[in-house]
From Swiss-Prot:
This is FAD synthase. It is an enzyme of class 2 (transferase). It comes from Thermococcus gammatolerans (strain DSM 15229 / JCM 11827 / EJ3). SUPFAM superfamilies: Nucleotidylyl transferase. Pfam families: CTP_transf_like (PF01467).
Amino acid sequence: MSGPSKGRKIRVLVGGVFDILHVGHVHFLKQAKELGDELVVIVAHDETVRRNKRRNPINPAEDRAELLRAIRYVDEVYIGSPGGIDFELVRRINPDVIAIGPDQNFNCEKLKEELKRHGIEAEVIRVPYLYKSDRAKTTKIIRRIVEEFCE
């Protein structure tokens, strides 16, 4: 990474679904923020969630974005486009660092190649697990809710 020009803040970008916000999300956002000065989040579009997770999101993208805006580590929030990574949006955000969550299904090297192909120069960093438990997994939280309230 060549780094930002003198005086420019280091901008960190993360993306994700962030459905049923939980402590694991908060720890990830905190760790990502510590990589720079500004933290920008791209929330997955509802169609993207349906395609990738094969289920509807519990909360619509607008609600997930509003919740993320309320977290002190987050400076800006965008809702992504339906489909894959919106490289045009990433280019506009102009991140210095892209932080990948510990359980996000991304190959960092392939992502770096894709970014380069789209003319985006950013360091890609996988954030390690800080808080690993069933309380920090959305699917396990949903399962517990179903078991507790639906059976």
